[in-house]
Structure formats: C-alpha cells, structure tokens
Amino acid sequence: MHAAACFVRPAPEKREELLQTLRSLAVAIRADPGCLVCAVCLEETSTFFIVVSGWASDADLRGHLRSEHFRVLSGASRLLGASAEVRFLASHPPSESPVSVPT
C-alpha cells in the first residue's frame, strides 16, 4: 500500500468548519480510482487533524496528488486559516521511487 498523511492545524475558531470540510472531502476521495482508505483522524485534546489515505499503487497516489480533491484539501486548509504538511508513509516493501508533492 502507498500512503500519505496530511497534517492540518486549523485556526481555533475554524476547527469545526474545517473538520466538516475534511470529512466531506474524505467521502469523495474514497471513490477515487485506487483509493483503499481515506480517514480523518483527530485527537480531542489536540488542535490538529490528520487525513490519512492509502492507495493501491504508486501511480494511484501520484494521481491523487494531482487531483482536484487534493487541490481542494490544500485550498480549504489555507482558506480556513490552517497550516498543512504532507508526509508519505513507508509501504512494505518501500516503493522504488520517492513521491514528490507538486508545489
């Protein structure tokens, strides 16, 4: 499995709005080709969310990173005063080529 995690830290007053946006977006991402899982994770005592997605292939993950859904995820984070960071989770066995995020 090829996986990515997006760590999103919203402005405190925008926390609930961003959570609802991320949950709706996760539903749409789950329908994307090659998506095995997409979940919004949060800790009640923390101020950040983690959106974790798993993909059947490296090509599926790369396609997601170029998708409208990923652009919406990035845009919603910025629009709602959040900072976001994307990290790639190691698959077993690790993929042969690293994935880079378009900027």
Task: Give the location of each predicted region.
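Short S/T/G/P-rich N-terminal loop/turn motif that feeds into the first structured element of a domain
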Residues: 1-49, 56-68, 77-78, 82-103
